[in-house]
Amino acid sequence: MLFTAFEDGGPMWTRSGPRVERCAVRFPTPFLGVPAVHVGLSMWDIAMDSNQRVDVSADEITPQGFVILFRTWGDTRVARARVSWMAIGPTEHEDDFLLD
């Protein structure tokens, strides 16, 4: 779960205007270079009494990890959201042949 704002009255549920949630992700195995990262909503629970405005993206991508950004604005109220991600890039492997 990226966040849940309904139970504790968090800003995504109780406020309006521009809001952002940030969630740091650390890769289990670091990549050899900066990977390509894809993020997408896998669940959202949003109030139906206003427009549903959401922007989800990957930021600060490094070989060690990245930050998920979940943004909304206006009068959109978000109770909770889950984001899935996939990172693609080269990693070390025990069969790699490295020259000195």
Question: Which role does the model predict for each range below?
Answer:
Residues M1-D100:
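Extracellular attachment/recognition segments
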